[in-house]
Amino acid sequence: MKNYKRMTVGEIVADNFNNAGIFDKYGIDFCCHGSALLPEASKTAGADMEKVIEEIEHLAPTTSENIDFKSWPLDLLVDYILKIHHRNIRTQGPEIEELLDKICRVHGEKHPSLYNVQALFHDSLSDLNAHLDKEELVLFPYIYEMVKAKLENTPLPEFHCGSIEAPISVMMAEHDIEGERYRHIEHLTNGYTAPEDACNSYRLVLQQLKAFEEALHQHIHLENNIVFPHSIK
């Protein structure tokens, strides 16, 4: 049996992504603060660590739906992030933003916190697009070169950023900003709960925002806890 008390929360989720649901339940941040050991993360979240461990140990066995990303080749995992997560942000983000703008026009006067959510999400998309560009144009191409050099047993080309740790530290800092931003959105929306007078579109945009945040959590988890550590090794 694993000693979860000596594992980071990022490692625990990397072992089985279904554990993410348990951490979400207790407010434990596994993506932006995945390097924290479980005792520390539990204390920060005000969670009973023993109860958390009990739920992890009683979780249903891994199924085919729980992909073992940490066993994937690094370049394949980067491909997955690009084709699934980056594409989702670029396509779903503007659609959610458009619907959110509509909801603000109709319901903003009665529910003024919507304007704060609108501003936060707008800033998020703007910053995320710049963030994705940096990964796609700078960091990920070099990771592909690293994998290629290792497979072909050839010298690694010089990186114009110096060391790969430099852009990775920038990406992780930007992940922290997004994590805090979506914690604020979740608070403003009462955990993405629609008010009683909400129309169907209002309820829909909250569902979409929640799904967007959950996908972003997995995106950040894959990079912070798997791709980046493996790239630095």
What are these regions (language model features)?
Residues 1-233:
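Small-residue-biased structural context
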